[in-house]
Structures are given as C-alpha cells and as structure tokens.
Amino acid sequence: MTTDVQNTTAAGVTAHDWGWRHASRKDFALRHVDFDIKPGERVLLLGASGAGKSTLMSGLAGVLGGDDEGEQEGELLIDGVDARQARGRCGLVLQDPDSQTILERAGDDTAFGCENLNLPKDEIWNRARAALDIVGLDYMAFDRSTRGLSGGQRQRLALAGVLAMHPGLLL
C-alpha cells in the first residue's frame, strides 16, 4: 500500500483537433485545439473570461458529459486513452471550493474520490490522512464538520481530496 503522492506516475496529455460545443450553444466553446504535454511537464493555461479554460479542464477531467450535454470533436487523450475513460488518472480542483465540498465530515470528503476508485478501505484512510498532512490540515480530525471551514481550509480540503487519489495529472 502506498500513501506517497510522489510515487505517482505523471500522465501525458494530447489534444488532436479537439473541440467541444455545449448542447445549449450554437458555437463551439473550443475548436481545433492541438497540444502535447509530456509527463511531468508543468503548463500554465491563461486566457480571458469565456475563452474556454474551464471547458478544457472539464474535458481533461472527463466530466463534460455525454452526447446529451454537448458535442465533442477530435481527441483529448490522457496517456493515450480518451479522457472520458481515464478519470482516475486526472484530478480536478475547482475554482469554487464550496462546489467541491460534498460531504459533511472532512475525512469523508477527503476519502470520497478514493472510494470512487474502489480502493481498499485501509488504503483510502491512509491516503486521506497523508493528503491532509500534505496540504497543512494535519491537525484536522476526520470527523470535523466541513460547514465551519474557512474558504482557505475548504480550498486545501478540495486539494487534499484530489491528492489522495494519486492522479497522474493535477488540474
């Protein structure tokens, strides 16, 4: 069993003429996107409001939805696998930590992603504790309510939940 995030294998990301159109829109949010990010590279995505940054991040995380939610063209790959099929390889920290705080207790919230990966219970809780330590919430009890957390604590809790999953790609 490993709780060491540093032992996680970094993921490579490739886009081939990728685009996405939300079902409620006439025009594509992004179109003809091409890039190749090698494992371990760090990339900054910068752009104006409405430029498609969140759409690309959601696409990489595999959470854009099916055909009823929009139309995809081209390929968006993580380690050569369609991003929609590689969800466990990618961790997404949302802009608004309140939208990522799902459960009532800090430990449950941190463990949530690992539970969805069907990891053994002991490993889930070891990873959750290690992730809370990494983000500076080592003092936080697993049964601590998420309701009274400050904005900064919520952001760190969201990051801990993602790090506990040991993603190869952190967004």
Model-derived features: positions:
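Helix-to-loop junction immediately C-terminal to a conserved catalytic motif
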Residues: 61
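A short, flexible loop at the N-terminus of ABC-type nucleotide-binding domains that lies
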Residues: 2-32, 64-69
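The feature captures the beta-strand-to-loop junction immediately N-terminal to the Walker
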Residues: 46-48
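Conserved catalytic motifs of ABC-family nucleotide-binding domains
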Residues: 166
